[in-house]
């Protein structure tokens, strides 16, 4: 297998973590049909609403995009600082999905993935780590929707 083929396979695999793939629904599917009132509801036995989870992941997506752009965003001193209050749901969802698509495209860019950050870590490693974080919380959003009786979404989704 050529280097180009390997890079393409890696890029698709990591890119799919940001948009969904064979092992999970996409963020678009998970958020489909979720209205603001429901997105802001927290089931009694769960710690977060879907909107809170999306705001948290968006915080880190924005942090990663700044990092990849060569900026040095501050890392929160405390975990709670990475959980901003959700803004307007429609705006949050649109911004979140736009940034997830940008990260997917970055993950599919061999030159960007090979580039090193200031600490000498390849961007591919950082993108993969953040993708794992995103998918973890994607599962939580699905669990919140299930607990609220809002799963599967209108367009369908895995029910197990």
What are these regions (language model features)?
Residues 1-24, 28-31, 36-80, 117-160:
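Short, contiguous alpha-helical
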